[in-house]
Amino acid sequence: TNANVYVIVNEGEVFQIDSGLKSSFNAIRKFYSENSLRPNYVLITHAHVDHIGALAEVYRYYKPKIFAHGLDLKVIRGEERMPNRSFLMRLFGAFIKAEPVREADEIINKNFKNIEVIETPGHTPGSVSYLYNDGKERYLFVGDAAFERKGKLFVNRTFSLDLKTAEESLNKIIGLKPVTILPGHGNPVKLEQ
């Protein structure tokens, strides 16, 4: 299914988290048009097609700076395929592909005001989360490092490449409370202290 796409307006700059499937682009463009915005940056949580499928369209239309973890960059750039543990992922990947975006760059050691990059591998080798602090609340955009169902967070065992590392990343995420978790699929989950 399609992934959630988030937008942060931070210090006058627009940060988009992930891009969803290619079919998401019209909704993304409509959102920006209706809100008189355009993305300065696209921060990718990981390189699965449901999170990067519309990335090439977003890049062509808006020319934002694109960042992802180095371990997933070769997939985004079209230089490698994402390894797949499950038959479902191989099947999904055979039918739905993302157009390469060669302009993507490494996120690690990149500094953005109020946004911290947190490595949360396991779902993919280069999975990262983005912790945004607006001065009042903390929000963690986790991609697929945590899935939400009925208000609970869990690791998706079918689509995660390294289950042990994914569980460790989920524990790291939970350890960041108080924070509102914004997953790639499902609804936000507020973790109290």
Listing of model-derived features with the role each one plays in the protein:
Residues T1-E34, S129-G143:
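Conserved beta-strand hairpin/beta-sheet module of binuclear metal-dependent hydrolase folds
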Residues E11-L43, L88-A104:
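Pre-active-site segment of Zn-dependent metallo-hydrolases
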Residues F15-I17, L43, I66, Y139-F141, ...:
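Residue-level marker for buried hydrophobic side chains located in beta-strands
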Residues S24-D72, V179-T180:
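Active-site metal-binding motif and surrounding structural segment of the metallo-beta-lactamase
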Residues I28-K30, L55-E57, E80-R81, N133, ...:
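Short amphipathic alpha-helical segments
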